[in-house]
């Protein structure tokens, strides 16, 4: 489970493509900001890209993620961010996809958000060419994570895996943290129709205090 606070401050991502190489990550303090600078190369082997479900080739990047050194909570929740965090190795965390249900689109999806039903990356991860670390490559060659790969991280409590845009730490704690987002029951009342299966983000609803985490976790 990815754990992050509700209030998103800001997240600068400066990117330019360069040649592939070894992992590089540096942390710098710039005034009131902490910046994680990386070349976009993970600290582990990645899957084969391109592959049958992902036509994109991996490319080394120049990434600069900056966030408040001292995070502050506010009363406002910010929605709609694609990048919700950066790993401690300097790789973006992007749980969402850019694909929506579209009866006229290829394989029933397109980048047109008109339907309001956004595809969940981890419902059928291999359909997006996601590798064993739950990451893949976008059109720019940027490798990013869609989820924590529980089989690839140490199984201990309160494992720091990264930082959110507001500066709060992101922990992986599967034994203590439980989500308050639940799969809806019944069937969808609008296209795409069918049972709530978890294929789309909108298949889930937030149920207050049904788990230990709030709506932003």
Model-derived regions, located:
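Domain-length functional cores that host ligand/cofactor binding and catalytic or interaction surfaces
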Residues: 135-217
């Amino acid at each position: 489970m990815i754990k992050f606070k509700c209030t998103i401050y800001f997240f600068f991502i400066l990117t330019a493509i360069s040649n592939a190489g070894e992992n590089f990550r540096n942390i710098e303090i710039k005034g009131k900001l902490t910046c994680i600078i990386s070349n976009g190369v993970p600290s582990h082997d990645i899957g084969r890209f391109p592959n049958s479900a992902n036509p994109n080739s991996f490319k080394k990047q120049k990434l600069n993620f900056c966030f408040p050194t001292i995070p502050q909570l506010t009363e406002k929740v910010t929605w709609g961010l694609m990048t919700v965090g950066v790993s401690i190795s300097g790789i973006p965390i992007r749980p969402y996809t850019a694909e929506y249900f579209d009866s006229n689109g290829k394989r029933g999806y397109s980048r047109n958000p008109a339907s309001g039903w956004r595809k969940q990356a981890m419902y059928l991860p291999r359909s997006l060419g996601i590798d064993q670390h739950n990451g893949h490559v976008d059109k720019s060659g940027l490798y990013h994570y869609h989820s924590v790969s529980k089989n690839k991280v140490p199984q201990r409590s309160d494992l720091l895996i990264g930082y959110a845009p507001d500066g709060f730490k992101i922990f992986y704690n599967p034994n203590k943290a439980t989500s308050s987002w639940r799969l809806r029951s019944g069937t969808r009342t609008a296209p795409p129709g069918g049972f709530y299966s978890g294929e789309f983000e909108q298949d889930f609803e937030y149920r207050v205090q049904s788990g230990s985490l709030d709506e932003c976790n």
